[in-house]
Amino acid sequence: MPIPTPYEDLLRLVLDRGTAKSDRTGTGTRSLFGQQLRYDLSAGFPLITTKKVHLKSVVYELLWFLRGDSNVDWLHRHGVTIWDEWASDTGDLGPIYGVQWRSWPTPSGEHIDQISAALDLLRTDPDSRRIIVSAWNVGEIPRMALPPCHAFFQFYVADGRLSCQLYQRSADLFLGVPFNIASYALLTHMMAAQAGLSVGEFVWTGGDCHIYDNHVEQVRLQLSREPRPYPELVLAHRDSIFDYTYDDVVVHNYDPHPAIKAPVAV
């Protein structure tokens, strides 16, 4: 049975048909709008194999989001530096993802824990069409070091299986999207475990899907490689989604091609 390669297929599509566009960083891109990838999470964990993805950074970043944190100090203590380019001298990033997920401010001065609210709905009203978590808080964007690229996500339950769809307004296909796919697939596994559900699909929807001009050669190298089977995720039991640690996330049989370095557009 052939290995599904929706991510690599999108890379090819953008290389072949993407429109040349300028961008905020001044780097230049090839871009397509409104693309979608689908992964059956019961068939394997969607960690890209055509280049090595740094799983440690994926896991610690997600745990950092779930902590409601927005300072890179905790990431640094665990050897993760992926947010350093945007952090202030004190390590602060403003009210980014984790703050919005766990402590969305209300006009009355209270705060909403969107992750806990989503879990409550999954347990009590799994057919709800309102199981959504948003990081796109328009009133707080000016205070964020970087406006959310992966802006909001929705959960959907059918036949005891939990699926998640992410909307990513801005998608750096070579560097960012492999991280995002793995991160939200892992989050879906965690939410499913906490709600007593099996995993269904992870659906990634991208707005501006782009390859930076200085990533084109790296993308061509990646696409020259033969994809390998996806690994298996084993997640330890925890009583709360906020109790997971790095050691609770084990990936078996990950056999990727070597990593490919590329500059980050800041």
From Swiss-Prot:
GO CC field: cytosol
Please report the name of this protein according to its UniProt entry.
Thymidylate synthase
Subunit comment: Homodimer.
PANTHER family under this entry? THYMIDYLATE SYNTHASE, THYMIDYLATE SYNTHASE 1
Q: Which organism is it from?
A: Mycobacterium avium (strain 104)
Q: Where does (6R)-5,10-methylene-5,6,7,8-tetrahydrofolate bind?
A: 54, 172, 265
Under the heading SUPFAM superfamilies, the entry gives: Thymidylate synthase/dCMP hydroxymethylase (SSF55831)
Q: What does this protein do?
A: Catalyzes the reductive methylation of 2'-deoxyuridine-5'-monophosphate (dUMP) to 2'-deoxythymidine-5'-monophosphate (dTMP) while utilizing 5,10-methylenetetrahydrofolate (mTHF) as the methyl donor and reductant in the reaction, yielding dihydrofolate (DHF) as a by-product. This enzymatic reaction provides an intracellular de novo source of dTMP, an essential precursor for DNA biosynthesis.
